[in-house]
């Protein structure tokens, strides 16, 4: 399965004439028999065609709006993460599009959209996945685009990549560091 953190569904059959584009990557992934499920988290921008594809029993969508509204009603991020992780089968690839985060974390990405994850929410979900007993078999981090006059996007992307490497190591029982606890 793919755990897909993104602002966009990326389920278009084609985008601007391109069958294999950033807007159709998850549609193309669904064409592979090895991909049994895509669990999308943080989605907040999509078209009608993508909604039709997402209604497949192989796609589970947790929109940013629904997650935020549940939080307003008292559902904790931990509870939401548990539900997201429960929707995944045993073997998981993480696909993280940086525009899944709040736009101020990656203002130079190609298609920023209001809303999204905080850095802490994203890293918490990934850490919970590492501890879940599911097997993380790979990951990617995409659409990180440092700006012309600053490296903020690159800084955030590098920190997320560092965390994702730690999540993969932890999931594979490699002891690469311990969490520092300042308060008991």
Language model features with spans:
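Catalytic cores of soluble, metal-dependent hydrolases
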Residues: 32, 46-51, 55, 60-184
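Active-site histidine-anchored catalytic micro-motif
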Residues: 1-41, 45, 132-136, 149
């Amino acid at each position: 399965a793919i755990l897909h953190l993104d602002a966009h569904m990326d389920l278009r059959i084609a985008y601007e004439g391109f069958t294999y584009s950033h807007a159709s990557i998850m549609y193309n992934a669904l064409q592979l028999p090895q991909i049994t499920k895509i669990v999308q988290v943080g989605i907040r921008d999509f078209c009608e065609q993508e909604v039709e594809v997402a209604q497949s029993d192989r796609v589970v969508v947790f929109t940013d709006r629904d997650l935020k509204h549940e939080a307003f009603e008292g559902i904790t991020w931990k509870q939401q993460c548990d539900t997201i992780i429960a929707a995944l089968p045993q073997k998981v690839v993480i696909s993280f599009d940086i525009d899944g985060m709040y736009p101020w974390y990656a203002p130079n990405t190609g298609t920023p959209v209001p809303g999204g994850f905080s850095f802490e929410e994203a890293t918490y979900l990934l850490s919970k996945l590492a501890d879940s007993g599911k097997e993380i078999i790979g990951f990617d981090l995409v659409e990180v685009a440092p700006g012309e006059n600053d490296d903020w996007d690159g800084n955030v992307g590098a920190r997320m990549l560092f965390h994702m490497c730690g999540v993969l190591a932890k999931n594979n029982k490699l002891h690469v560091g311990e969490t520092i606890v300042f308060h008991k």
